[in-house]
From Swiss-Prot:
Organism: Idiomarina loihiensis (strain ATCC BAA-735 / DSM 15497 / L2-TR)
Protein name: DNA replication and repair protein RecF
Lineage: Bacteria, Pseudomonadati, Pseudomonadota, Gammaproteobacteria, Alteromonadales
Main location as per UniProt: cytoplasm
Entry's Gene Ontology BP terms: DNA replication; DNA synthesis involved in DNA repair; double-strand break repair; SOS response
Gene that encodes it: recF
GO cellular component: cytoplasm
Length: 354
């Protein structure tokens, strides 16, 4: 998908914005705090239904207004997202109302690189599950319905566990259902990582020339037994603490460099390079399966990678023939790293000029 036009209304510090980006490389310049990252944030919203920055949706609404609208048009789709101060959300696809954000998100495959992306490798498992599940969601159609069913079952069982009102026979039903969907989710993740690792190893050779890298799945339970048996063996613990302690919701991935977890093997600078390779690997895998590129959002590239890896990333992005949005203080920092001249935009006081 390529965004042909992007319109923002009362989003962050923008009143009204209409943008016609290049289908290739776009560089957005401006001082810190000018709003250039907010432009990336609006595109991200179309692919995820939320911001990648801290805070709730009300912070996205320009002060003094009742809501914001983000609208984009591509060759095949017209997509609009509106959120109001009362929490109401409105989604539009080709002029019709849609109920589920997943129906919109599936059409807008967005890959994001920010200074905080390295936290995927350093922080808790939640961000790593989001990383892998983005990929599975976009290439395995049944994954979303499996995940919705699993999370609903998990919520119901946890509620009963907290209330201390879960008879043995009824609990068996919840565990059987959780095991069924949880193992389907885990198999989808395993298949995805098996395919993704080929791309990771290729890109690691380019970005980390002396490092061999791969990603391994930790399913969320001891896989020497079935998930049902694992749930059975943790029943007393679950009743004691009031939540389900094993399952697909406890999964994690281990990113390994030369046989050691990356956070114990690589320097801070190398970790930034490693997450860049992982994100590009996801994008390349998506492009191979879906036969169309992702949209890449890169915030503050020059502060994250050294000059050599900046040039390498820019070359990789250009070779993908993808639509790319990159923020920088000045265009001179990046424009010479692309073979073809990128389209330049400048943000100042909530106004974008080409």
């Amino acid at each position: 998908m390529f965004i042909e036009t992007l319109n923002l209304s009362h989003f962050r510090n923008f009143s009204e914005v209409a943008l016609s980006p290049s289908p290739k490389i776009n560089i957005i310049t401006g001082d810190n705090g000018s709003g250039k990252t907010s432009l990336l944030e609006a595109i991200y919203l179309l692919g995820f239904g939320r911001s990648f920055r801290p805070g709730g949706f009300r912070q996205l609404i320009k002060e003094g207004n009742s809501g914001f609208t983000v609208f984009c048009r591509s060759q095949d789709y017209a997509i609009g997202v509106r959120r109001s101060t009362d929490g109401e959300q409105s989604l539009r696809l080709n002029g019709a109302n849609v109920q589920r954000m997943s129906d919109v998100a599936r059409l807008v495959p967005v890959q994001l690189l920010t200074p905080e992306s390295v936290d995927i490798l350093l922080e808790g498992p939640g961000q790593r599950r989001q990383f892998i599940d983005w990929g599975v969601f976009h290439v395995e159609h049944s994954f979303y319905s499996d995940w919705v069913a699993y999370t609903q079952l998990l919520k119901q069982r946890n509620s009963l566990l907290k209330q201390r009102s879960l008879p043995v026979r009824e609990d068996r039903y919840w565990k059987e259902q959780l095991a069924y969907y949880g193992e389907r989710i885990s198999k989808s993740r395993e298949k995805y990582l098996e395919e993704l690792n080929d791309y990771i190893q290729e890109l690691a050779k380019s970005f980390l020339s002396d490092v061999t890298m791969e990603v391994r799945l930790k399913s969320g339970w001891d896989t020497s037994q079935s998930l049902f048996d694992a749930l059975e063996s943790h029943t007393e613990k679950d009743k004691k603490y009031g939540f389900t302690s094993v399952g697909a919701h406890k999964a994690d991935i281990k990113v390994i460099a030369d046989g050691v977890e990356v956070k114990h093997r690589l320097s801070r600078g190398q970790l930034k390079t490693a997450i860049t390779a992982l994100k590009l690997a996801q994008g390349k895998h998506y492009q191979k399966i879906k036969r169309q590129p992702c949209i890449y959002l890169v915030d503050d590239l020059t502060s994250e990678l050294d000059s050599k890896n900046q040039a390498l990333l820019c070359r990789e992005l250009e070779n993908l023939d993808a639509q790319v949005f990159i923020t920088a203080i000045t265009g001179k920092q990046l424009s010479d790293k692309f073979q073809k001249s990128p389209r330049m935009f400048h943000v100042e006081h909530g106004v974008i000029n080409e």
